[in-house]
Amino acid sequence: MIKYSSNVWIKIILFNLFIVACLGALMRFKIGFEFPYFDQKKIQHAHSNFAFVGWVTQTLLVLIVGVIAPFLNTIQLKKYNQLLWVNLFCAYGMLVSFIIQGYGLFSIAFSTISIALIVIFTILFFKQAAQFKQYFQAIKWFKGALVFAIFSALGTVALAYMMVTKNLHQTPYLASVYFYLHFQYNGWFFFACMGLFTGLANKFNVLIKNDKLIFGLLFWSCIPAYFLSTLWAHLPIWLYIIVVAAAITQFVGWILLLKSVFYHLHLESKCSNTMMFLIYFVAIAGFVKFTLQ
């Protein structure tokens, strides 16, 4: 059960990070030195897919289950735990198969299973969301995160199709890559982290003011903000205007969030100095990110 094996998951996740780092070092080694045993492109695919599925996604899923575990019965918790192990299995399957064959039958099969797993996880979460009343503000962020996780898979499907059919053209290839990356980074990762932060605030009985408005601004603006990654594609002026509006909307949403968080000054007395440092660090990082957009 997840509540009794948190230390195990932490060790697994850290080991997965170690593998990601080793693959990254190997790719850089091959740039400067002869190392014929592995294909650079295949290692790159293995590195990126394992980093996303085996490290970041695994971490977020474990943390989300950790938040909701106290509200689950034994059967429900067992289902989530099984999904975590299946995701881990898929991640290692992708790691090995991408190194050996690149985009092929087995790597695509493991990728497909990992996508199906996220869909199943999302369905379970949505069904049981009413149980997590203490973290009612965090739930909407988790829901948004899972929706974007599924949505980002469209980019993976498009990439797999182009790789298998050898029908590679620069514009659709890059558009698919950026589609996947945008809805992973700015969708799945960002909203899951926001859910974890909001859940922490709820735990200390701190409610985020205008939470629904902030969520709505950031969620709906995330979709057209994808085109910020495709400005090189010579977008029509009407779409460019929408993209600019989306960037401004995200900035406004972030400012409202910061205003609400720092309004609750008593939060500081309930958090350690390390936690407060992380909160300020994230606040500044997010401000810089949305300002640059």
Where is each model-derived feature located?
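Hydrophobic alpha-helical transmembrane segments of multi-pass integral membrane proteins
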Residues: M1-Q293
